[in-house]
A protein has these predicted regions:
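Conserved beta-strand hairpin/beta-sheet module of binuclear metal-dependent hydrolase folds
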Residues: 2-51, 171, 175-190
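Active-site metal-binding loops of divalent metal-dependent hydrolases
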Residues: 8-10, 38-41, 66, 98-100, ...
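Short active-site oxyanion
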Residues: 32-34, 59, 91-92, 186-187, ...
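Active-site metal-binding motif and surrounding structural segment of the metallo-beta-lactamase
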Residues: 43-96, 208-215
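Cap/insert and terminal regions of metallo-dependent hydrolase folds
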Residues: 66-73, 79, 168-177, 181-269
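Active-site neighborhood of divalent metal-dependent phosphoester bond hydrolases
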Residues: 98-122
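Active-site-proximal loop/helix segment associated with metal-binding centers of metalloenzymes
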Residues: 109-110, 131-184
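Active-site regions of enzymes building and remodeling cell-envelope glycoconjugates
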Residues: 123-127, 138, 261-268
Length: 277
């Protein structure tokens, strides 16, 4: 599997690419290509063009969850496909938890997708997945994450609307991740980890049956985090003994320093290319 970072909060020296506070990764695996999230804007299109990546050739877009910094780029992708006359008969799969495109609010401000999922039906085929979904033989969408650790994934972020139209606390149940399975272990890729980074890793291990974690890449939702939670998260990763962690996006410097005492931390930024056999 090859992973290229198209959107992150940071970019690297001498890459001359554009960063924004969001997530978008391009994946190549098993003869297929994917986008994992789409960032806030059209930045991912700009960066993909510079890196020689043709996003019109992707097989699927995978949405980690419905927040705006992961979904708003979908509108720009649809506009781009329209401009290049992408055939509407060859629809791109749009894989997400069923709740991902429900309205989301924080302090009366919309923080969810800027259009309902049906608005993208010209170019995308919606795949609602609450359970595990095989993207390829070796790449899995985890669906709704089990939350068993009592120190994470327990608090709502604003409000959402349920299937009956009632406003409820948003525990971001749509937050998911993907996992690459290989002969030497698993690679876990996250968006924001609102469900809890340790919960995600635990669930990936449960679903795959493989405790050999090669890498965890993405947002860990460790931003202005209490020291007690950081300590428990660091202890978890120390016990996990993963080969490498690539914390980024919603992971602040304090969290990275804490994690560095427990695991091998690697740099992430727009333009980074990671290869896993």
């Amino acid at each position: 599997m090859q992973l290229t970072v198209l959107v992150d909060n940071n970019t690297l020296i001498d890459k001359y690419l554009t960063a924004e506070p969001g997530v978008c990764y391009h994946l190549r695996i098993d003869g297929k290509t994917f986008l994992f999230d789409t960032g806030y804007s059209d930045v991912f299109l700009h960066n993909a063009a510079i890196l020689g990546i043709d996003v019109s050739k992707i097989d699927s877009v995978i949405i980690s969850h419905g927040h705006n910094d992961h979904t708003w780029g979908l509108t720009h992708l649809a506009q781009y496909l329209d401009r290049i006359n992408h055939p509407s008969t060859k629809k791109i799969k749009l894989v997400a938890h069923p709740n991902a495109f429900q309205p989301k609010y924080h302090e009366d401000k919309s923080i969810g997708a800027n259009l309902p999922a049906d608005s993208y039906s010209t170019f995308f085929e919606r795949v609602n997945q609450k359970g595990v979904y095989h993207l390829t033989d070796n790449l899995l969408f985890l669906g709704e994450i089990e939350r068993n650790n009592n120190f994470e994934g327990r608090y709502p972020i604003g409000k959402t609307v349920d299937c009956c139209g009632h406003e409820i606390d948003d525990f971001v149940l749509d937050d998911s991740a993907i996992v690459y399975t290989s002969p030497t272990g698993i690679v876990i890729i996250t968006g924001c980890s609102h469900s809890g980074i340790c919960n995600i890793v635990d669930y990936a291990i449960k679903i795959t049956g493989d405790k050999r974690v090669r890498a965890v890449i993405g947002g860990f939702h460790l931003l202005n985090t209490e020291t007690s939670i950081l300590n428990r998260t660091s202890h978890y990763f120390q016990q996990l003994n993963a080969e490498a962690l690539y914390p980024c996006h919603c992971t602040d410097l304090k969290a990275k320093i804490a994690l560095a005492s427990a695991a091998n931390i690697e740099e992430v930024g727009v333009g980074v290319v990671l290869n896993f056999k």
